[in-house]
């Protein structure tokens, strides 16, 4: 619950290894900080949530430039505007990082619910960080429930899906 009007509510700090120096402020958030998903030094997706007003906000953080810019905001209760979660892959250190396409200017988003006026139709989309537009590139058919379980190759869009129908059990 946010009771006072202030310029920011949370500050995200970092300290460099071997963790003996002073912490450095990365950015401040207007509402409550919820999560950060890292890509590289120029891309991290920062999530802010304000539960009392049912608001959800995603921004892109560029650690190299020190900038935080809003990508989109939506209502937490509006499933139709939920873009899903960024697809991740393991980097050379074995850590999950955001999978990018189009020379790092777009992010793959996986919506395993895919609320639509025709029911739940999960989808995979490409979110363009420059134009702030989302393009659905794969969607479950209406006669089944199928979602992307894993993206094996983001560049060539090789993926594994889990599929089931009223008469067929899930394929794995």
Task: Describe the role of every protein-language-model region.
Residues 1-172:
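Peripheral, non-catalytic segments that deliver or gate enzyme domains
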């Amino acid at each position: 619950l946010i009771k006072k009007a202030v310029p920011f509510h949370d500050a995200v700090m970092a300290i460099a290894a071997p963790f003996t120096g002073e912490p450095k402020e990365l950015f401040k958030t207007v509402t409550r900080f919820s999560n950060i998903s890292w890509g590289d030094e120029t891309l991290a997706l920062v999530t802010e949530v304000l539960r009392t007003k049912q608001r959800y906000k995603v921004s892109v953080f560029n650690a190299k430039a020190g900038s935080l810019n809003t990508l989109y905001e939506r209502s937490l209760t509006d499933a139709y505007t939920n873009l899903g979660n960024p697809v991740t892959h393991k980097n050379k250190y074995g850590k999950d990082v955001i999978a990018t396409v189009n020379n790092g200017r777009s992010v793959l988003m996986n919506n395993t619910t895919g609320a639509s006026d025709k029911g739940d139709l999960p989808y995979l989309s490409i979110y363009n960080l420059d134009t702030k537009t989302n393009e659905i590139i794969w969607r479950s058919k209406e006669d089944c429930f199928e979602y992307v379980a894993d993206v094996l190759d983001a560049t060539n869009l090789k993926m594994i899906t889990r599929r089931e129908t009223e008469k067929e059990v899930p394929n794995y």
